[in-house]
């Protein structure tokens, strides 16, 4: 893929952003993917059956996304991660925007993300996806307790307990353009 964006950071340094589909040596990106999913076994369960996209800036891999087919014209975004020191700078948004463009002919795109299982508490990831047009669909109670050996804690100290699924329907958003 060609460079998709040129942007400036807070220091007004011009940066070139590249988004590339990775076909070989995907395992080299497991450390980056493990920022969003700490289970290497879980990452390996979807990495090699999915499409891996890497966003890099000035030659450094900053964000990664894995999307898999889950049915006829339905896909699931299994992982969207950004280096800790690069979070909240727009890289994840740029990569997600590109993914949504690439899969604009899909009937539906799903994403599952963690929740603390506490009423009126949600992690920033849920509002992040909602900003892009994802809508809440359902919750799998105790998903992280039942599927991960070690507890997973978010930046705010709350434990991931439930898996919250959201969906995005490209045709609803393509009409708005």
Label the predicted regions:
Residues 93, 116-158:
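Conserved active-site alpha-helix within GNAT-family acetyltransferase domains
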Residues 27-64:
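Active-site rim helix/loop that mediates acceptor-substrate recognition in acyltransferases
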Residues 1-24, 170-177:
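Conserved N-terminal entry element of GNAT/NAT acetyltransferase domains
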Residues 54, 60-69, 74-81:
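Conserved beta-strand in the GNAT
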Residues 103-118:
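Conserved GNAT acetyl-CoA-binding A-motif
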Residues 86, 90-98:
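Conserved acetyl-CoA pyrophosphate-binding loop and the N-cap/start of the following alpha-helix
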Residues 80-88, 114-116:
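A short, internal acetyl-CoA/4′-phosphopantetheine-binding micro-motif in the GNAT/acyltransferase core
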């Amino acid at each position: 893929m060609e460079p998709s964006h040129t942007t400036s950071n807070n220091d007004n340094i011009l940066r070139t952003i590249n988004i590339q589909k990775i076909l070989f040596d995907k395992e080299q990106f497991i450390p980056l993917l493990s920022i969003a999913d700490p289970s290497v076994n879980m990452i390996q369960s979807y990495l090699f059956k999915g499409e891996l996209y890497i966003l890099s800036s000035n030659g450094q891999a900053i964000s990664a996304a894995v999307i898999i087919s889950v049915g006829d014209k339905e896909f699931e975004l299994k992982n969207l991660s950004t280096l800790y020191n690069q979070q909240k700078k727009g890289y994840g948004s740029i990569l997600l925007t590109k993914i949504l463009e690439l899969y604009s002919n899909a009937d539906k795109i799903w994403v599952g993300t963690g929740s603390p299982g506490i009423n009126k508490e949600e992690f920033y990831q849920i509002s992040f996806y909602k900003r892009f047009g994802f809508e809440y669909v359902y919750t799998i109670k105790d998903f992280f307790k039942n599927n991960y050996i070690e507890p997973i804690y978010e930046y705010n100290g709350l434990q991931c307990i439930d898996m919250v699924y959201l969906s995005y329907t490209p045709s609803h958003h393509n009409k708005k353009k």
